[in-house]
């Protein structure tokens, strides 16, 4: 029992005792005593009632990470896709995931057909009041575009600003805290931008290739010339690349027309593995890129790690 509650009980007992030994047919003395007791209760300090954190559900953990960095202790975040050893394209929705979405105040999805299962979850939870952020829509991307938009750090800056504004609207008591954390997030992206600028000075125009367009937006930021896009899009869409596209890819590797091969380390198939083998036989550097943020890393550390791996591979 709290000290405040004990004190209130003592006051109440005292008030009753002070009037019990006297006869007061009108009850005036009793009412006056209670008024004095209530006055004391009003003057006593009361413990503050903690605000309920804003519940956020993110389809992917890199968006959940940004939400956590902006929201801090004022939010709770659940990320649906968070296992870097799982192929995101094979994800299946479970009832527990649906329950989490239905209770969220803010939902973040990637859009551009990367996580189409989110639309079904939101439709099933149609009665709830929530704010839905579609990141692809924030940056002008649509179905048919490369959906791996988080590999462009500017995308995450746009998301962070949107989150800070939405959280401030939903929870105005902590508006200044959200704005302060947004400022820290923006500052933390600057080293990534500086690293990209430095690497762009070294690698602009360099021909590179990939088994899927996971790293595509980062390639573009680095000024690299990306080849074999028809092959990459076919693999991403789980369709068989055309024979001419396969032949062109193999030729680029065997003749070293490309300086680097990036593969999706979360989604491998026989033809992608074959390209890796040919690249290694042809002494073309090979690095893996993940679609999902690795555990115990922030988005910032993850992107810096990917950039360092690219720089190291090309320096060999």
Stretch-by-stretch model annotation:
Residues 18, 38-40, 146:
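Residue-level detector of alpha-helical transmembrane segments in integral membrane proteins
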Residues 35-47:
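Bacterial N-terminal signal peptides
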Residues 27, 47-49:
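Intrinsically disordered, low-complexity segments enriched in proline/serine/threonine
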Residues 50-316:
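Extracytoplasmic metal-acquisition and chelation regions
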Residues 1-32:
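N-terminal secretory signal peptides that target proteins for export/translocation
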């Amino acid at each position: 029992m709290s000290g405040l509650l004990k004190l209130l009980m003592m006051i109440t007992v005292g008030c009753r005792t002070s009037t019990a030994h006297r006869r007061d047919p009108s009850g005036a003395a009793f009412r006056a005593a209670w008024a004095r007791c209530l006055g004391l209760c009003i003057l006593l300090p009361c413990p503050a009632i903690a605000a309920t954190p804003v519940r956020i559900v993110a389809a992917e953990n890199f968006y959940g990470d940004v939400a956590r960095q902006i929201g801090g202790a004022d939010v709770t975040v659940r990320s649906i896709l968070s296992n870097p050893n799982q192929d995101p394209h094979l994800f299946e929705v479970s009832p527990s995931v649906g329950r989490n979405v239905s209770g969220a105040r803010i939902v973040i999805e990637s859009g551009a057909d990367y996580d189409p299962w989110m639309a079904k979850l939101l439709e099933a939870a149609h009665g709830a009041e929530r704010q839905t952020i579609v990141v692809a829509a924030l940056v002008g991307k649509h179905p048919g575009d490369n959906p791996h938009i988080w590999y462009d750090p500017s995308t995450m800056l746009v998301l962070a600003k949107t989150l800070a504004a939405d959280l401030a609207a939903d929870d105005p008591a902590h508006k200044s805290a959200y704005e302060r954390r947004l400022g820290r997030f923006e500052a933390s992206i600057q080293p990534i931008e500086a690293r990209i600028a430095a690497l762009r000075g070294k690698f602009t125009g360099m021909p590179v290739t990939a088994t899927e367009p996971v790293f595509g937006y980062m390639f573009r930021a680095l000024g690299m010339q990306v080849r074999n896009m028809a092959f990459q899009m076919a693999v991403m869409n789980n369709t068989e690349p055309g024979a001419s596209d396969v032949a062109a890819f193999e030729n680029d590797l065997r003749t070293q027309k490309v300086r680097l091969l990036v593969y999706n380390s979360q989604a491998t198939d026989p033809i992608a593995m074959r390209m890796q083998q040919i690249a290694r036989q042809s002494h073309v550097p090979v690095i893996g890129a993940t679609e999902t943020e690795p555990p115990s890393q922030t988005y910032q550390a993850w992107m810096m790690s990917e950039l360092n791996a690219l720089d190291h591979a090309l320096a060999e």
